Structure formats: structure tokens, C-alpha cells
UniProtKB/Swiss-Prot annotation:
Name the record gives this protein: Putative 3-methyladenine DNA glycosylase
Domain of life: Bacteria
Gene3D superfamilies cross-referenced by the UniProt entry: Methylpurine-DNA glycosylase (MPG)
GO BP of this protein: base-excision repair
Molecular functions per Gene Ontology: alkylbase DNA N-glycosylase activity; DNA binding
Amino acid sequence: MSKILSAEFHQRHSLVVARELLGCSLVRRLATGEELRGRIVETEAYTPDDPSCHAHRRNTPRARSMFALGGISYVYIIYGIYHCLNVVTQGLGEGAAVLIRAIEPLSGNATMAQLVQKDPANPMRIASGPGMVCRALAVDKSLDGVDLSSQQAGLWFEQGPSLPDQAILQTPRIGINSDPHTVAAPWRLIVADSKALSGTRRQNQGQAYQAQPDWFQKQAI
């Protein structure tokens, strides 16, 4: 088993965490003992000064988990039916997170395909979207607010190979329709050659550009 990412890993700026989660594994242990594992290939960063962030300017019951110290989960529901998994980032009370948008299945593919009712012969489409990630890994609101630096809740991250900047593309986030600056912010990060991405060809290629060395650290200052 690879090293589990520590809580301290997540207690940094959302952009840094979103970048460094790419290539890491997201692991879900089911009640049966089976472990489902996927390589993270798409993330989105959110910070409290961002109007599109659920924690922007206020602490609501829905977003309460976002104000915990980085390293716990924030699971919410969209459209009344789909769950989305985030890892809380930064410091206590800040209200920041990274959304896990897509993974490439590594193990437990047949179970994941069954959970999302997809063809197991096409694993790259099993978890290509935030709602599908949660369906494929059986993640729901019962896993909101759990410690992701421990195996206790059956959901955690494992360290993966470090990806070079040349392998990463930045794009605007998907589904953001607030102020123009927020819409244009390149805070969606993708593994360039992945076949499991959630966006359209235009979103993944036409609106994308290669990540620049040290850009993420500079944005976090």
C-alpha cells in the first residue's frame, strides 16, 4: 500500500493541493472489505474569497465541514440527487476545498461499473465527473466531515508519482457562472493525456493551457 496523505498535505492553499493531488489515488473501502481505487486526473480549487465557493462570506449548515482544518471531507448534493466529494484545505475556519472531478479506475473496476451502471469494458468513463466519482465509490452524505488522512471511515488518499508541469493543463472551472473574473480563473487542473476527464473537447483542449512552473505556489502567496 502507498503512503496515506497526511492532514498536513491538505493544510495548504487550495491551488497547491489541487495540483499535487493529480496522480494520487483516491481509495474507498466498502463494508465488504473490497477496496476501490482510482487515480485522480481532474480537480478544481475553491477559496473563501471566491464567489463560487460555498463558504464565500458565510458559514452555512450546508458548508459547515469546509470550515474545519484541512484534511477532512466535504460532501454535498447537487440537483437534489448527485453527491460531490471535496477535501477541505487550508486552515481552521478558512472555508476552502478541492473538488475531485474525475478519476481513472485502478482496482475494483467491476464493482465501480456496477455502481454507476456503466460498461466495465470502458473503465475511463466510469468516474468521469464529480457525481460519477461519488457513485463509483459509494460516497454519500454519511461520509461528510470524515478524516481523509485515516482509514477509519473507509475513504482516504494515497500518494502517487509526482507529475511534471508538462503533464498538467489548466482550464476555467466547469459550471461557474458568477462574476467574469471567477468564470475565467484557470482553477481546474487536469492530467493532459487522461481519457477519463469530465469536460467537453473544447473545455479540455480549446480553453486549456499548460501549467507554468511555480505558478501554483506563487498564487498561494
